[in-house]
């Protein structure tokens, strides 16, 4: 099943707390169906979401209508009321979020307020329910593309810098050492794109916008 939670609706883009589950085998003709799910504790849009073991989902951060950025987080479950968990040190809207092989969750970069972005990276421990900081990104950035690599490391590519510069740089987080290190540059500045790890271990970075803020149909 697929969880869709939060977001914004209406003329004023008001955040919602509702969730919806998509069942690909549901419906009369088994073409898929949507059903209502357990609501979040806090209405939020642009939150980070990562599936944890045992059908739990970490929902962290996000924002409300008035551009207040949340550091709070909660654990969503399909059958019971959500449970509040530890808070992040800063907000990470439009950052990168990835589940690591050790079960922890990496949340890095993103927007921390209506005037600044961050290089801070944090790890969520689902056992203790707490966040702790780890090695930061090389610079503050948001709207990056992120992908988990086959060996458990995490690629962070492109995005926007704190001076609104369009980035081609990329870096890799190694959970074994707890550090970020430089990687190759994208041939094209790209922000707001997506990254997908392929079966051969390579990463496809596609779509997003270029340095002129024009939509891209290309891929690297």
Indicate residue ranges for each PLM-predicted region.
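Kelch-like beta-propeller repeat domains
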Residues: 1-220
């Amino acid at each position: 099943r697929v969880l869709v939670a939060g977001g914004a609706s209406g003329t004023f883009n008001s955040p919602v707390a509702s969730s919806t589950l998509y069942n690909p085998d549901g419906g009369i003709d088994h073409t898929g169906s949507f059903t209502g799910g357990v609501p979040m504790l806090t209405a939020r849009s642009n939150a980070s979401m990562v599936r944890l073991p045992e059908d739990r989902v970490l929902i962290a951060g996000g924002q409300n209508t008035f551009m207040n950025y949340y550091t709070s987080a909660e654990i969503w479950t399909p059958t019971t009321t959500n449970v509040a968990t530890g808070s992040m040190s800063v907000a990470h809207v439009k950052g990168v979020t990835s589940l690591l092989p050790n079960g922890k969750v990496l949340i890095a970069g993103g927007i921390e307020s209506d005037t600044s972005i961050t290089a801070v990276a944090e790890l969520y421990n689902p056992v203790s329910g707490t966040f702790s900081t780890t090695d930061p990104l090389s610079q503050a950035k948001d709207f990056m593309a992120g992908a988990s690599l086959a060996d458990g490391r995490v690629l962070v590519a492109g995005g926007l810098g704190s001076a609104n510069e369009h980035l081609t740089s990329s870096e890799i987080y190694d959970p074994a050492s707890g550090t970020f290190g430089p990687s190759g540059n994208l041939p094209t500045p790209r922000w707001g794109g997506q990254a997908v790890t392929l079966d051969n271990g390579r990463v496809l970075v596609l779509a997003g916008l270029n340095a002129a803020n024009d939509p891209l149909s290309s891929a690297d």
